[in-house]
């Protein structure tokens, strides 16, 4: 047993994994796979694509990395509970919404906010970006933020407003928010893949994608392209989830809705992305407009929290309870 522990301590580089020589290790590092955990949560196809080795060989490398990282095996419920103690929660700025989400947005999970135009999705993303830079005692992570902006909706002026209302230095807050504009779905996927490079230079604990599905929706039109769209969207979401797992980060995404023509009673609106997004997002929050600056937030999916809804307010100061 002691020998196994010693071997684990020694095996700290990619070259220590069986089947990984200098050339393969270099290709892996160039593509963001530069530690054992990154290899352990990868798929054989991903490693095969970036290194040129066969999927069988890639699977063996991943299996060895998982053994070293001590993941991928059966665990007791007690062990999982202990591991979940590493999970942290980021405040939304609204106590009502925090309570609905069990204390805020969880790390190592994807939280999706979906709704019609003007429902407050982008406002919440801006607020989360500001909140992430706040001290831990105020519900933040005192860390940097990465945002993939697909619709050119990021506004530094809004960040300044929100930062001032929180008593933060707006210039310092802006310096800690790293924004990349995604011009199409493939560029969006590439930015998510390369996010790890930025995370190594800065302490990134929040990754935002606003909006998750806009490019996929506009580029893949018709039933003939649906399978390809869903395949790419699936890969993209798993890249995001992997980032959250490796860096113990919050993943927050926005999503658009469309009307279902077959629904005659009740709310006909449904989020874009179908089962792929529905099954991969850990928490799903439906936002609807109400009177004035009020919004109704409904939690419709969670692994352990009950469905429910609450009222929040979006004002000049940001996202709050309006009291």
From Swiss-Prot:
GO terms for biological process: DNA recombination; DNA repair. Keywords: ATP-binding, DNA damage, DNA recombination, DNA-binding, Nucleotide-binding. GO terms for molecular function: ATP binding; ATP hydrolysis activity; ATP-dependent DNA damage sensor activity; damaged DNA binding. The keyword Cell division does not apply. ATP binds at residues 115-122. Belongs to the eukaryotic RecA-like protein family. Involved in DNA repair and in homologous recombination. Binds and assemble on single-stranded DNA to form a nucleoprotein filament. Hydrolyzes ATP in a ssDNA-dependent manner and promotes DNA strand exchange between homologous DNA molecules. This is DNA repair and recombination protein RadA. The lineage of its organism: Archaea, Methanobacteriati, Thermoplasmatota, Thermoplasmata, Thermoplasmatales. The gene is radA.
